[in-house]
């Protein structure tokens, strides 16, 4: 059982919702925001 690095379809299921969208990887919503607007920051402590 070798790791077919050149062909990721073997260990990467192509079901709807399993593939990373927009930015790719696990970078969260802040990296996938393509709208060009700044994120709304809610300050909870300090100042």
From Swiss-Prot:
Location(s), subcellular: Spore core
Polar residues: bias regions: 33-47
UniProt GO cellular component terms: endospore-forming forespore
Protein's UniProt name: Small, acid-soluble spore protein N
Pfam families listed in its UniProt record: SspN
Annotated signal peptide: none
Induction or repression: Expressed only in the forespore compartment of sporulating cells.
InterPro entries on file: SASP_SspN (IPR012612)
Stretches for region Disordered: 1-47
Disulfide linkage: none
GO biological process, one term: asexual sporulation
Family membership noted in the UniProt record: Belongs to the SspN family.
Subcellular location, principal: other
Top-rank taxon: Bacteria
Keywords: Sporulation
